[in-house]
Amino acid sequence: MYKIYTSYFSNKKLPEDIQKIPICSKILSPGNYATYYKELAPNASDVRDLYNQNITEVEFSLNYLNKLEHIREDRSLDLIVQDLELRLEYSDIVLLCYEKPNKFCHRHILAQFLKKNYDFQIEEF
């Protein structure tokens, strides 16, 4: 079975054959993407508030985890998980956002959430 990774759009080390899937509210980087999981993006207001330092990283994380729980409860996250499982039959997957690996980013929260709730092993690429 193939693997799931997280990374950032401008990572030049990503292989050409990896399935690239954005998980942010806006895609500013042109590219050939396998699909787009906009549902996994944090709320735009939380991103703005974090950027403007109106909320802390802890508050952002709690808000994002609440969003993930909500989409898990309404079963839309199950559809994404099923799609990921199908895609893993063909090649590795990378879930993309903008922040560099050493910066705070929702993709790291998502990776932990998917590990805890769906037993996915996700690494930063």
Where on the chain are the PLM-derived regions?
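Residues lining hydrophobic/aromatic ligand-binding pockets adjacent to catalytic sites
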Residues: 1-125
